[in-house]
From Swiss-Prot:
It is an enzyme of class 3 (hydrolase). It catalyses: GTP + H2O = GDP + phosphate + H(+). InterPro entries: EF-Tu_GTP-bd, EF-Tu_GTPase, EFTu-like_2, EFTU_2, G_TR_CS, P-loop_NTPase, Small_GTP-bd, T_Tr_GTP-bd_dom. This is Elongation factor Tu. It comes from Amoebophilus asiaticus (strain 5a2). Residues 81-84 are annotated as: G3. NCBIfam families: EF-Tu, PRK00049.1, PRK12735.1, PRK12736.1, small_GTP. Its EC number is 3.6.5.3. Belongs to the TRAFAC class translation factor GTPase superfamily. Classic translation factor GTPase family. EF-Tu/EF-1A subfamily. It is found in: Cytoplasm. Residues 174-176 are annotated as: G5. GTP binds at residues 19-26, 81-85, 136-139. GO terms for molecular function: GTP binding; GTPase activity; translation elongation factor activity. CDD domains: EF_Tu, EFTU_II, EFTU_III.
Length: 395
C-alpha cells in the first residue's frame, strides 16, 4: 500500500477515548496509531508511552493526560487519553483538552459500568457533541447474542443522556487483537476511524464565532481615548466595528473600536488568539476595568445565577481538607477576575466532599457576561479549590 504524506492542511479535530477503567481505552489508542502507521499516517505509540501520562496544570489543577497525534486520509487528529477516572472528570470539566467528539470504549465482556455512565453524563453536560462507540474485547465473548445485548444497553444509555443512541455508529472489535497485528481486528480499527471521520463533525473555528475579548487592563492615551487590553477569546474585530462592554454590575456600555494595536503596531483587525489593545471611542477609563468583556453587541448577556457541573479538589491535590455545605461562599474566577458567589446544593445533598464532582447552583454578588459552557475556577483566598463549567443560566 502506498504511503500517504503527512499533511498539515487537513482539517483538524480534537477527540479522546472515554469509558470505564480497564475497558481498553489506552490499548485502543495504541492500536489506532499502529494501524494508521502502516499507511504512514501516524507514529506508533506503545501502550506504556501513552499510559505514562505527563502531568499538566490547568486552572490550578493537576491533570495527567496523554496527547497522541495521528491522521486519517481525510483529517488530522489530536487524541487525548487519561490514565485515571479522576483525570477524565477534571479534564472534561476544566476543558484542559477540548474534545470535539469522543470514542466511547465499552468492553463486551462487562457491558456498561458506573464510569461508562459517568463519562456519558459528563460528555453531555460539558458539550462533547458526538460519540462513536467501540465495543471492545468481542473476541473474548463466545455468544454473539451477548454482544447484541451489550450494544442495546449502550444505545439505551446514550439515549438516556440525550445522545442519538439509535444512529450512533457502534463498531465491534478487539483493540488488543489489532495491536497484535491480527488482520481481522486491524480492519475493525480502520472501520472505527472511517466512522469517526464521517460521524464527528468538524468544529466551528473560534475565528468564525461572535467576537469576545475579556478585559485585562485599561489605560488612557492623551488625545486618543481609552485603550482596553486583553487576549481575543473568539471571533474577529475590525477598526470601525461597534462593540458592547459588559459585566461587573456596571451598565452595558456601547462603543466603536477606532484602533487595534498589537506589539505597538497599528492593525486594521485582530482575531482569536491575538493579544491586543482596542482603542474605544467615547469611553471613560474609569468606567471599564478588568473582569468586563468587550463583545459583538447583543451576543452575550450579563447574569448572576447559574447551574454548573463542578469538580472539587481533593486534599492531596491541594484542595480543601473538609467538606463544604449549603450557602458556601467562595470566589468564582471567570476569565480574568474573581467574583464572590453563594452555593446552593441540590435537594438531598447535605455536603460536598473534597474529590467529589456534582451539579450545583450559584448566585454571584455581581453580574458577569456568561453563557452556557463558560468555565471557571473556584478559589478561596487565591487558592484553587475546584473547577466548573456552566450548564444552565438561571436568571
Amino acid at each position: 500500500m502506498a504511503k500517504e504524506t503527512f499533511d498539515r492542511s487537513k482539517p483538524h479535530v480534537n477527540i479522546g477515548t472515554i469509558g470505564h477503567v480497564d475497558h481498553g481505552k489506552t490499548t485502543l489508542t495504541a492500536a489506532i496509531t499502529k494501524v494508521l502507521s502502516k499507511r504512514g499516517l501516524a507514529q506508533v505509540r506503545d501502550f506504556g508511552s501513552i499510559d505514562n501520562a505527563p502531568e499538566e496544570r490547568e486552572r490550578g489543577i493537576t491533570i495527567n493526560t496523554s496527547h497522541v497525534e495521528y491522521e486519517t486520509s481525510k483529517r488530522h487528529y489530536a487524541h487525548v487519553d487519561c490514565p485515571g477516572h479522576a483525570d477524565y472528570v477534571k479534564n472534561m470539566i476544566t476543558g484542559a483538552a477540548q474534545m470535539d467528539g469522543a470514542i466511547l470504549v465499552v468492553a463486551a465482556t462487562d457491558g456498561p459500568m458506573p464510569q461508562t455512565r459517568e463519562h456519558i453524563l459528563l460528555a453531555s453536560q460539558v458539550g462533547v457533541p458526538n460519540l462513536v462507540v467501540f465495543l471492545n474485547k468481542v473476541d473474548a465473548v463466545d455468544d454473539p447474542e451477548l454482544v447484541d445485548l451489550v450494544e442495546e444497553e449502550v444505545r439505551d444509555l446514550l439515549k438516556a443522556y440525550k445522545f442519538d443512541g439509535d444512529n450512533i455508529p457502534v463498531i465491534r472489535g478487539s483493540a488488543l487483537g489489532a495491536l497484535n497485528g491480527e488482520p481481522e481486528w486491524e480492519a475493525k480499527v480502520e472501520e472505527l476511524m472511517d466512522n469517526v471521520d464521517e460521524y464527528i463533525p468538524l468544529p466551528q473555528r473560534l475565528i468564525d464565532r461572535d467576537f469576545l475579548m475579556p478585559v485585562e487592563d485599561t489605560m488612557s492615551i492623551t488625545g486618543r481615548g481609552t485603550v482596553a487590553t486583553g487576549r481575543i477569546e473568539r471571533g474577529v474585530i475590525n477598526v470601525g466595528d461597534p462593540v458592547q462592554i459588559i459585566g461587573m454590575g456596571a451598565q452595558n456600555l456601547n462603543s466603536t473600536v477606532t484602533g487595534v494595536e498589537m506589539f505597538r503596531k497599528l492593525l486594521d483587525r485582530g482575531e482569536a488568539g491575538d493579544n491586543v489593545g482596542l482603542l474605544l471611542r467615547g469611553i471613560d477609563k474609569e468606567k471599564i476595568h478588568r473582569g468586563m468583556v468587550i463583545c459583538k453587541p447583543k451576543s452575550v448577556t450579563p447574569h448572576r445565577k447559574f447551574k454548573a457541573e463542578v469538580y472539587v479538589l481533593s486534599k492531596e491535590e491541594g484542595g480543601r481538607h473538609t467538606p463544604f455545605f449549603n450557602k458556601y461562599r467562595p470566589q468564582f474566577y471567570f476569565r480574568t477576575t474573581d467574583v464572590t458567589g453563594e452555593v446552593k446544593l441540590p435537594a438531598g445533598v447535605e455536603m460536598v466532599m473534597p474529590g467529589d464532582n456534582i451539579a450545583l447552583e450559584v448566585e454571584l454578588i455581581n453580574e458577569i457576561a456568561m453563557e452556557k459552557g463558560l468555565r471557571f475556577a473556584i478559589r478561596e483566598g487565591g487558592r484553587t479549590v475546584g473547577a466548573g463549567q456552566i450548564i444552565e443560566i438561571l436568571d
